[in-house]
UniProtKB/Swiss-Prot annotation:
HAMAP family: Ribosomal_uS9_B (MF_00532_B). The keyword Ribonucleoprotein applies. It comes from the Bacteria. GO terms for molecular function: RNA binding; structural constituent of ribosome. Gene3D superfamilies: 3.30.230.10. Keywords: Ribonucleoprotein, Ribosomal protein. This is Small ribosomal subunit protein uS9. GO terms for biological process: translation. SUPFAM superfamilies: Ribosomal protein S5 domain 2-like (SSF54211). Belongs to the universal ribosomal protein uS9 family. GO terms for cellular component: cytosolic small ribosomal subunit.
Length: 130
């Protein structure tokens, strides 16, 4: 790994993101595509930008990201978590500010499994009294 490059792994739901940051002009590449092309949804892009906007570092780093699994929302959350970890690897003094915003904590919520005899995880079949 390059001397001035920092790495962070982020996870959310069933998505996992590998984030590499290095000093640059603010280019973000996700799976060999620009962020705007990869995420059509504005909300997903906003989630990705959150840690950088918080620290006013929007144009200080170039980000190279690979992300696998899950959907749009999970991938965006995984990337945010990865960026946060990479920024902490770059400068540990950023941790309290990122922690206060809630970006350091891994969101542990996962999909609940479907149970036998139920239609979904908790949805029971309709009850008929007679």
């Amino acid at each position: 790994m390059a001397e001035n490059q920092h790495y962070g792994t982020g996870r959310r739901k069933s998505s996992a993101a590998r984030v590499f940051i290095k000093p640059g002009s603010g280019n973000i590449v996700v799976n060999q595509r620009s962020l705007e092309v990869y995420f059509g949804r504005e909300t997903a892009r906003m989630v990705v930008y959150q840690p950088l906007e918080l620290l006013n570092m929007m144009n200080k780093f170039d980000l190279y990201i690979t992300v696998k699994g899950g959907g749009i929302s999970g991938q965006a959350g995984a990337i945010r978590h990865g960026i946060t970890r990479a920024l902490m690897a770059y400068d540990e003094s950023l941790r309290p500010e990122l922690r206060k915003a809630g970006f350091v904590t891994r969101d542990a919520r996962e999909v609940e499994r479907k149970k036998v005899g139920f239609r979904k995880a908790r949805r029971r079949p309709q009850f008929s009294k007679r």
